[in-house]
A protein has these predicted regions:
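Conserved alpha-helix/loop element of class I SAM-dependent methyltransferases that forms part
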Residues: 3, 7-8, 32-33, 37-41, ...
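Conserved nucleotide-cofactor-binding alpha/beta core module
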Residues: 65-185
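N-terminal auxiliary segments of SAM/dcSAM-dependent transferases
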Residues: 1-35
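Substrate-binding/catalytic lobe of Class I Rossmann-like enzymes that use SAM or dcSAM, i.e.
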Residues: 166, 173-209
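Extracytoplasmic beta-sandwich strand-turn segments characteristic of Greek-key/jelly-roll folds
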Residues: 46-47, 136
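Short clusters of hydrophobic/aromatic residues that line enzyme substrate/ligand-binding pockets
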Residues: 28-29, 38, 43-45, 129, ...
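Active-site/binding-pocket entry motifs
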Residues: 26, 35, 44, 183, ...
Length: 209
């Protein structure tokens, strides 16, 4: 997967390539899809959600420019695969999932695989996780129509926010925001297609740990 799907498509960061080679993607897909786990395409994981294709996971991880001591926020835990990749590189990963059942399953899988530097919370990803801000990087794995202001506010200086932006009926663009001492720099890159970032059932949510 690393050589054929990632290096050939321009992924160069060694930490990202090593993480992608180490994390067992088959543990993050439903059992009937295990044989398809290492194909470069998204797969359904239930509740209308998907696990992103490996190239997209690698691209977002590389674009975030994560350093070994970094604190990272992920919005859209899904099955936990992106969080596991981030946890191989960063010191701390905080991840928020709107679907409680997915959050519980992701936490269970991450625990079974020994990831002790990941904290999972079920809640509204639009609000981020302000109690642990600022974050050196924020990775959003579902598409909002506009970038939520709370996520921008929770980004550390020199931090990077990686997010697909757009509606389900128009082109979405992978977008990179960088916070500099002088303000925010926004860069739109290639077209993508992600499930929408939802914010249903607003209420107080508690961490699972």
């Amino acid at each position: 997967m690393v050589d054929q799907q990632l290096r050939l498509r321009g992924i160069e960061a060694q930490a990202v390539l090593a993480a992608m080679a180490k994390v067992p993607r088959h543990r993050f897909v439903p059992p009937p899809l295990t044989r398809q786990a290492y194909e470069d395409r998204p797969l359904p994981i239930g509740y209308g959600q998907t696990i992103s294709q490996p190239f997209i996971v690698a691209y977002m991880s590389e674009a975030a420019r994560i350093t070994p001591g970094a604190k990272v926020l992920e919005i859209g835990t899904g099955s936990g695969y992106q969080a596991a990749v981030l946890a191989e590189i960063a010191a701390e990963v905080y991840t928020v999932e709107i679907v409680p059942e997915l959050a519980r399953q992701a936490e269970r899988t991450l625990r079974e695989l020994g990831y002790r530097n990941v904290r999972v919370r079920s809640g509204d990803g639009y609000q981020g996780w302000p109690q642990h801000a600022p974050f050196d990087a924020i990775v959003v794995t579902a598409a909002p129509e506009r970038i939520p202001q709370p996520l921008i506010d929770q980004l550390a200086v020199h931090g990077r926010l990686i997010v697909p932006v757009g509606t389900q009926s128009e082109d979405q663009r992978m977008t990179v925001l960088t916070r500099t001492p002088g303000g925010i720099i926004e860069q739109k890159t290639f077209p993508v297609r992600f499930v929408p970032l939802t914010r249903e059932k607003p209420k107080e949510y508690q961490p699972y740990r």
